[in-house]
């Protein structure tokens, strides 16, 4: 069925919505819902901290030592502070390599959690477009232990910006 007058329909929907809300907020429970909704809209968003990312990285480091995983990954060893977001994105892409190469469920779960934590922490940061930074493929390939040490160093740059 095709509606010929969408403007009229949206007006009707707005009227029904207004009537529904007006009747709902006349009750005491409706007022409580409204007040709690306003309060929750003003609460700060809970975000993952970079400390959790570091603890996951250390856990991955221990797990990799225990299973003797050997991989070479693109690693940013001396990132400029103005390129830390670009470097972090490269590290997160390389984590996916660990995810694919690892057959250990503990490592896979921890890596997936770390990717989610780091991405949510990154999304809360306002940053300018970084220019003059190396692309991921331009970085030197290093073993997984060096990769994790450099990753921790980059995360610390987010914790202690200087």
From Swiss-Prot:
Residues 30-48 form a propeptide. Residues 1-29 form the signal peptide. Glycans are attached at residue 119. It is found in: Secreted. InterPro entries: 4_helix_cytokine-like_core (IPR009079), IL-15 (IPR020439), IL-15/IL-21_fam (IPR003443), IL-15_mml (IPR020466). SUPFAM superfamilies: 4-helical cytokines. GO terms for cellular component: extracellular space. GO terms for biological process: immune response; interleukin-15-mediated signaling pathway; neutrophil activation; positive regulation of cytokine production; positive regulation of immune response; positive regulation of peptidyl-tyrosine phosphorylation; positive regulation of phagocytosis; positive regulation of T cell proliferation. It comes from the Eukaryota. It holds the Pfam family IL15. Keywords: Cytokine, Disulfide bond, Glycoprotein, Secreted, Signal. The keyword Disulfide bond applies. Disulfide bonds join 83-133, 90-136. GO terms for molecular function: cytokine activity; cytokine receptor binding. Belongs to the IL-15/IL-21 family. Cytokine that plays a major role in the development of inflammatory and protective immune responses to microbial invaders and parasites by modulating immune cells of both the innate and adaptive immune systems. Stimulates the proliferation of natural killer cells, T-cells and B-cells and promotes the secretion of several cytokines. In monocytes, induces the production of IL8 and monocyte chemotactic protein 1/CCL2, two chemokines that attract neutrophils and monocytes respectively to sites of infection. This is Interleukin-15. It comes from Sus scrofa.
């Amino acid at each position: 069925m095709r509606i010929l007058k969408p403007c009229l329909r949206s007006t009707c929907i707005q009227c029904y919505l207004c009537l529904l809300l007006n009747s709902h907020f006349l009750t005491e429970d409706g007022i409580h819902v409204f007040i709690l909704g306003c309060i929750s809209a003003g609460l700060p968003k809970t975000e993952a901290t970079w400390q959790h990312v570091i603890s996951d990285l250390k856990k991955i480091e221990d797990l990799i030592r225990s299973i003797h995983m050997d991989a070479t990954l693109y690693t940013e060893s001396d990132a400029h502070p103005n390129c830390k977001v670009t470097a972090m994105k490269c590290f997160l892409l390389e984590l996916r390599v660990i995810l694919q190469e690892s057959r250990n469920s503990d490592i896979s779960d921890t890596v997936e959690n770390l990717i989610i934590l780091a991405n949510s922490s990154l999304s809360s940061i306002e940053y300018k477009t970084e220019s003059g930074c190396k692309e991921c493929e331009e970085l030197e390939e290093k073993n997984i232990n060096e990769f994790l040490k450099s990753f921790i160093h980059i995360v610390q740059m987010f914790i202690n910006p200087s």
